[in-house]
Amino acid sequence: MSVTVEILENLERKVVLSLPWSEINAETDKKLKQTQRRAKIDGFRPGKAPLKMIAQMYGASAQNDVINELVQRRFYDVAVAQELKVAGYPRFEGVEEQDDKESFKVAAIFEVFPEVVIGDLSAQEVEKVTASVGDAEVDQTVEILRKQRTRFNHVDREARNGDRVIIDFEGKIDGEPFAGGTSKNYAFVLGAGQMLPEFEAGVVGMKAGESKDVTVNFPEEYHGKDVAGKTAVFTITLNNVSEPTLPEVDADFAKALGIADGDVAKMREEVKKNVSREVERRVNEQTKESVMNALIKAVELKVPVALVNEEAARLANEMKQNFVNQGMTDAANLDLPLDMFKEQAERRVSLGLILAKLVDENKLEPTEGQIKAVVANFAESYEDPQEVIDWYYADTSRLQAPTSLAVESNVVDFVLGKAKVNKKALSFDEVMGAQA
């Protein structure tokens, strides 16, 4: 099969496919005879309409189908013969100069995967993040858990920061009510930042039954465009004040956290174990991000546009599905521009190609034991870990995510062994405040 692969721009290639008319006509005749056997045409018994009539009715579409099928088949035959690593799907175009009457020519335009060459990793710098969990961090976490279980009890006094208040309010701009500016029995916690600072400051010091007018200046960057940069006067009536009460760290508190016998020491150990696992996950994520950045720097790579577009479309669909899951049912019909995902998509495709090369060259495929360890780590935070483990192994397709994580872990360890490693110790607050 003699064809010439023409190099276009970047990773784009072009081949001209030649389809003999004799083959096209023979395949078209076969398809028309198949159609004849199935055809139900008025005036004829099923399958008995003349072939000439079938050809008149369906000949053009049958020939078009045959050409499409032959083009696809011929292209992939060429790709195999020429050892072309095709990325994405080819685009087929007609050739204007059909100078050979014996054949029909079609141009296939496609991209190929780039040659990935890993640079000198010893020249790259990466950060290995560390953090520790001790008694102070356990105390801090227990305090957070206490606050999450805060109870509010009614009090007959003026409102203070930290209190939960229930109010009626009516806002006006230039003497006119505005959308979203009125509510009855609206509850919020003073000092939690749920309302604008001027609004909250106006409520502090009020007692139940009192009313007052409070002037509020909406910031220019306020999310409500109709009121952004404007001044409103709110008439506020305070209906109820409740002060927060935190639970004691005792047996009842421990039982509420799942410690059956209410042993506080056991509870603290469980808290430490869970927090340590989360801290480890987050520092590993930050270290992995540093490693991935180093790999991007170490490899000069042009990525196939087709793969970037596919990944961008996948990210757009993922975002829409997340919106739907949050209750925004109309989000499924959102027309999200793919350009907003292009940078992220290009990075993901690049890393996918780099990691595949690195794993293949350095035999970094995970062992069965490594995959099991990832699954066990997933399962550890559940009430019945064995049930979770069994779920993963009931369907091997569910092991894709644990396998990918095991691969990434091997890659991170490999790069850390080659690159210049700068250790970076973070505080508990820095780790838990990081997005991971």
Curated annotation (Swiss-Prot):
- Per the record, a Pfam family? Trigger_C
The UniProt record lists the PPIase FKBP-type domain at: 162-247
For this UniProt entry, the molecular function terms from Gene Ontology, in alphabetical order, are: peptidyl-prolyl cis-trans isomerase activity; protein folding chaperone; ribosome binding
One GO cellular component term noted in the UniProt record for this chain: cytoplasm
- Recorded catalytic activity of this chain's protein: [protein]-peptidylproline (omega=180) = [protein]-peptidylproline (omega=0)
Q: What EC number(s) would the UniProt record show?
A: 5.2.1.8
PANTHER family per the UniProt record, alphabetical:
TRIGGER FACTOR CHAPERONE AND PEPTIDYL-PROLYL CIS/TRANS ISOMERASE (PTHR30560), TRIGGER FACTOR-LIKE PROTEIN TIG, CHLOROPLASTIC (PTHR30560:SF3)
**What is the protein name for this chain?**
Trigger factor
Query: Which source organism?
Result: Neisseria gonorrhoeae (strain ATCC 700825 / FA 1090)
Gene label: tig
